[in-house]
Amino acid sequence: MKGLFLRIITALALLFWAIDMVFPWQFLRHTEENHYTAIQARGSLYVGTINNQISYFINKDSERGFEYELAKAFADTLGVELEMKIFDNQEQLFDELDKHNIDLAAAHLLYHPKNAERFQIGPAYHSASWQLAYRKNENRPKNLGNVKKDIYISNNLALEETLKELQKQYPQLIWKRNQALTQEELLLQLAEGKIPYVIANSIDIAAIQQIKPELAIAFDITDEANVHWYLPNNPYRDLQTALLNFMNNAEETGLLDNLKEKYLGHISQFDYVDTRSYMNAIENTLPQFSPLFEKYKGELDWRLLAAVAYQESHWNPDATSPTGVRGIMMLTKNTAQHMKISDRTDPEQSIKAGSEYLHWLISQLPESIEKEERIWFALVAYNIGLGHLIDARRLTQNLGGNPDNWFDVKKNLPLLAEKRYYSQLKYGYARGYEAHQYVENIRRYMNSIVNYHRVQENQTTNDNANNESAVKNLEEIKENKD
């Protein structure tokens, strides 16, 4: 009997111990929100990001950006609406993620062990590094030991952890964390000479250089690190699993490559002299022609039409080439006759005809090419002719690529100048490498116009807000005196 009693007591003790061990986890699972089911229930995916020219921005009243388009595709696979929530810096983003106010954070966020402990992470989809940026024509430091002036960073605790580690090697290293300005705003202040150094994400620096060529890179602070989306730390893995499946599919279908090409392809090319000349032209020459580009844009973005004109003539109405093309859109005699214009050097006639010709080229393309990509194919035809574009698409198909995909066709354009390929094509030799660069330049020029105006509008908004704040402070001071 005594033995039975002891066995019962032991069994009860083990049972209570087991409950004690299991209950906290079970309690957590029952009290912690399952984000995947919450997303399905509310019918929307909350994605936090940062407003800049790569991750997310508004263009012609529509949402754009690498992270926006990728998040939209993810929301579509979940069968829910996408709702973007915008923050000024990484810490604001992570604080809201920690509070479970957003479902994921997407802003080209670099991997850091501290953040990986704090949150779940999605698959890597890109890479970047931290770099020290300085103003061109200033002394370029060779390493952190040579930096004698203030280094500024945005509100980013993970970056600060990295700098604290570097401080062991460079004891004199100090930095200032600015919680009021975004990383992009700090880089703009650096370009204007208001601050001496900024440590920023290599992607953001390359993007800002396209409109602020005064920015220069001194050196990398860190090696390349993977870029991830971050998710709330949660005992449920449903959302993380769905994201893993989505990213794998985005890789296989080419979605990731297409987005990288669209938003990051142009920033890999940077020439100080060309960019500086172009920004001067945007400020001083474009305003006299922009009304015409807007007037005759048709179905195109007027800034794209302006970019084509800059690539063709640098916005010079009297431009002439040795081959006989003339005017701001550099039209041939045949094209001018086809478009029924009498004076190729008249800016209005030239812009109108150039736009109509581009629209005609777009109309000649097969419907199987997606709407967003049709313009890039048309620009190839504008540059080297419709026949050579047909050859490029046929060659792409012969080589196992997709003739309707710009990313695939663009890679094969240079092959039009190689005899082993053009000898097998209907229209023969073409300077396909020039057409490839032609389209890349136009994309870069267009993005620079878009982002130049975006930055100008943001600065105007900030100035107005500061003025309103100053007026309010003066009124409060006056009231206090009264």
UniProtKB/Swiss-Prot annotation:
> Where are the active-site residues found?
E312
Polar residues: which segments have biased composition?
458-470
Family, similarity comment = In the N-terminal section; belongs to the bacterial solute-binding protein 3 family. In the C-terminal section; belongs to the transglycosylase Slt family.
**Which species?**
Haemophilus influenzae (strain ATCC 51907 / DSM 11121 / KW20 / Rd)
Region (Disordered) residue ranges read: 458-482
What's in the GO CC field?
A: cell outer membrane
* Major enzyme class: lyase
Q: What keywords would UniProt list here?
A: Cell outer membrane, Cell wall biogenesis/degradation, Lyase, Membrane, Signal
Reaction catalysis annotation: Exolytic cleavage of the (1->4)-beta-glycosidic linkage between N-acetylmuramic acid (MurNAc) and N-acetylglucosamine (GlcNAc) residues in peptidoglycan, from either the reducing or the non-reducing ends of the peptidoglycan chains, with concomitant formation of a 1,6-anhydrobond in the MurNAc residue
Pfam families documented for this protein = SBP_bac_3, SLT
Entry keyword Signal:
yes
Q: What is this organism's lineage?
A: Bacteria, Pseudomonadati, Pseudomonadota, Gammaproteobacteria, Pasteurellales
Localization of this protein: Cell outer membrane
The membrane-topology field of this record reads:
Peripheral membrane protein
Q: Give the protein name, as stated in the record.
A: Membrane-bound lytic murein transglycosylase F
* SUPFAM superfamilies assigned to the protein according to its UniProt record, in alphabetical order: Lysozyme-like, Periplasmic binding protein-like II
